[in-house]
From Swiss-Prot:
Entry protein name: Small ribosomal subunit protein uS7
Gene Ontology terms: cellular component: small ribosomal subunit
GO molecular function term, any single one: tRNA binding
Family to which this protein belongs: Belongs to the universal ribosomal protein uS7 family.
One GO BP annotation of this record: translation
Alphabetical list of CDD domains matching this protein: uS7_Bacteria
Gene this chain is encoded by: rpsG
PROSITE patterns assigned: RIBOSOMAL_S7
UniProt keyword annotations, A-Z: Ribonucleoprotein, Ribosomal protein, RNA-binding, rRNA-binding, tRNA-binding
Stored HAMAP family: Ribosomal_uS7_B
Pfam families for this protein: Ribosomal_S7 (PF00177)
Subunit structure: Part of the 30S ribosomal subunit. Contacts proteins S9 and S11.
Gene3D superfamilies: Ribosomal protein S7 domain
Length: 156
């Protein structure tokens, strides 16, 4: 950790189509090797597929999916007297959304559909309906925290 001043968070400019900064941040998670236009095509394509399939506002579905994936607690390793304990800690809001986005992209890439836009759309729809790989990951993280509840007095 820096001993000097805390570096200010940089604001992400909102995306051009929907005007959502959360969506712009998500595009940055989808982006590989700085190819932002490709990431934009993928995300917008996925949102088009979502709106086509569900006949709902795609941004609403996106935020619903993120809400269903966002973890509330996670475990952190803490070394106490030669033993390492998995200590459950609450996840702060910024990290919560970052983890949700990361998991959404990760489990989208592992899906079997043909294009990345289709994979992402499928994972978004599944996450909005509380199923799919990313939601399972969140449940695993919560289960891990619940199992290690006894060590919660080892605060950081």
């Amino acid at each position: 950790m820096p001993r000097r001043r805390v570096v200010a968070k940089r604001e992400v400019l909102p995306d051009p189509k929907f005007g959502s900064s959360t969506l712009a941040k998500f595009m940055n998670h989808v982006m590989i090797s700085g190819k932002k236009s490709t990431a934009e095509k993928i995300v917008y394509g996925a949102l088009d597929i979502v709106s086509e399939k569900l006949n709902k506002d795609p941004l609403e579905t996106f935020s619903e999916a993120l809400e269903n994936i966002s973890p509330l607690v996670e475990v952190k390793s803490r070394r106490v007297g030669g033993a390492t304990y998995q200590v459950p800690v609450e996840v702060r809001p910024a990290r919560r959304t970052a983890l949700a986005m990361r998991w959404l992209v990760e489990y989208s890439r592992n899906r079997g559909e043909k294009s990345m836009a289709q994979r992402l759309a499928g994972e978004l729809i599944d996450a909005a309906q509380s199923k799919g790989g990313a939601v399972k990951k969140r449940e695993d993280v919560h289960r891990m925290a619940e199992a290690n509840k006894a060590f919660s007095h080892f605060r950081f």
